[in-house]
């Protein structure tokens, strides 16, 4: 995997004049909904390598989610803290996958909850009114409605295509996105997304595309990220 130098990323940080502790989206509810790439980290056990691979990508994403199903508690804490330190100067929100306690401990910007995790109301109570709370809703519109009612900031649908990262029996379709335009929160599409197959999903209304291996496992992750962005016209 080719990873560009983090020099350009550091230059971006150096030019940042307003260092925020909370993403503007969280402080200003009248701002437009986020639209673009929602990057999710891979199961990387080397923290330095994780940071080196992630840093050059931050300029092109909307949100970052820390997800590592192989790490123990100590490593997860170490990596989450390192990613938070990386994200804060840029204003990119960091969410934690499936670990409400870790999100609260490090002061992350939010949490993403799956099928068997704490519900959105518990997460909202623990993380506060400004946290970004996402819920996996698979292909279930009613689950999405209940999640939003419980306090979810966004809902995730998928898998849209077969995925090697996370297998699931659920299949979502562009029609599902067209049926959920009324939900009033960002909808995240996930599952086997590539620059060649995302056009129908974007056209159907997905505000965010969640990607892991399509970017991190690419020969050139920055080039891959730009390919996704080009489909979003951003």
UniProtKB/Swiss-Prot annotation:
Keyword Transit peptide attached: no
Substrates-to-products reaction catalysed: 2-[(2R,5Z)-2-carboxy-4-methylthiazol-5(2H)-ylidene]ethyl phosphate + 4-amino-2-methyl-5-(diphosphooxymethyl)pyrimidine + 2 H(+) = thiamine phosphate + CO2 + diphosphate; 2-(2-carboxy-4-methylthiazol-5-yl)ethyl phosphate + 4-amino-2-methyl-5-(diphosphooxymethyl)pyrimidine + 2 H(+) = thiamine phosphate + CO2 + diphosphate; 4-methyl-5-(2-phosphooxyethyl)-thiazole + 4-amino-2-methyl-5-(diphosphooxymethyl)pyrimidine + H(+) = thiamine phosphate + diphosphate
PANTHER family: THIAMINE-PHOSPHATE PYROPHOSPHORYLASE, THIAMINE-PHOSPHATE SYNTHASE
Record's cofactor remark: Binds 1 Mg(2+) ion per subunit.
GO BP terms, alphabetized: thiamine biosynthetic process; thiamine diphosphate biosynthetic process
Alphabetical list of Gene3D superfamilies matching this protein: Aldolase class I
Cofactor(s), names only, from the UniProt record: Mg(2+)
Residues reported to bind Mg(2+): 98, 117
Protein name: Thiamine-phosphate synthase
Keywords of this entry: Magnesium, Metal-binding, Thiamine biosynthesis, Transferase
Pathway where it operates: Cofactor biosynthesis; thiamine diphosphate biosynthesis; thiamine phosphate from 4-amino-2-methyl-5-diphosphomethylpyrimidine and 4-methyl-5-(2-phosphoethyl)-thiazole: step 1/1
NCBIfam families hit by this protein: thiE (TIGR00693)
HAMAP family: TMP_synthase (MF_00097)
Gene responsible for this protein: thiE
General function of this protein: Condenses 4-methyl-5-(beta-hydroxyethyl)thiazole monophosphate (THZ-P) and 2-methyl-4-amino-5-hydroxymethyl pyrimidine pyrophosphate (HMP-PP) to form thiamine monophosphate (TMP).
